[in-house]
Amino acid sequence: MTEYVLILISAVLVNNFVLVQFLGLCPFMGVSNKVETAMGMSLATTFVLTLSSVLAYLTWAYILVPFELEYLRTISFILVIAVAVQFTEMFVKKASPLLYRVLGVFLPLITSNCAVLGVALLNVRQEDATFMSSLTYGFGAAIGFSLVLILFAAMRERIAVADVPEAFRGPSIGLITAGLMSLAFMGFSGLIKL
C-alpha cells in the first residue's frame, strides 16, 4: 500500500509530467486561458490518461512481450490511446449529452497530447510494473496534469487583468509564469526517491 502512495505522490508532485518532464505542454499553454476550459480538459484527460495507462500496460504485458513484439510498442500505444479516446467519446455522448457538449472539443485533442503517450511509454519501462502500479502511475500523472493545468489557468486569469508591461503580454508572461511554477515544483524533488 505504501508503494502505491509513493507512486501517486511521485507522479503528482515530484515528477510532474508538465513541469518536470515537459510533456503535455501544448494543452498546458493552449487550453489554460480560463479555469472552466482547463477543468473540462483536465477531467477528460484524467479519465483517458488513467484508462490508456492501464490498457497500454495490458497490451505490453499480454501481447507485445509474450509474442516478442516489443518494437511495436510506440505504434501500438498510439492505437490504444486512440481507441481509449474514441471509447470515452462514445460513452460520454451516450451517458451525458450535456457533458459531451462541454467536453466535445477537448476529447479529440487528447489523442494528440504527448503526455498520454509519454505516461504509457514510461510506465512500461519500469522494471517491476504491475497492473496496480500502472493504474496508480496513470492516475497520479493525470491528477498532476490536472492540478498544474487548473493552477496555471487561475494564474493566467489573474494576469489577464493585471498591469503587465507590453513586451511581456500574451505567451511571454505565460511562459515566465510556467517557469516559476516549475521552480516551485522543484522544491518537491527530494521528497521521494523511488
From Swiss-Prot:
Main subcellular localisation: membrane
EC class name: translocase
Superkingdom of origin: Bacteria
Record flagged with keyword Cell inner membrane: yes
EC number in record: 7.-.-.-
An annotated GO BP: electron transport chain
GO cellular component entries: plasma membrane
Membrane topology category: Multi-pass membrane protein
InterPro entries: Ion_transpt_RnfA/RsxA, NqrDE/RnfAE, NqrDE/RnfAE_oxidrdctase
Keywords: Cell inner membrane, Cell membrane, Electron transport, Membrane, Translocase, Transmembrane, Transmembrane helix, Transport
Residue intervals passing through the bilayer: 5-25, 47-67, 72-92, 102-122, 135-155, 172-192
Pfam family, one: Rnf-Nqr
Subcellular location per the Swiss-Prot or TrEMBL entry: Cell inner membrane
Functional note: Part of a membrane-bound complex that couples electron transfer with translocation of ions across the membrane.
Subunit details: The complex is composed of six subunits: RnfA, RnfB, RnfC, RnfD, RnfE and RnfG.
Sequence similarity: Belongs to the NqrDE/RnfAE family.
Name by which UniProt lists this protein: Ion-translocating oxidoreductase complex subunit A
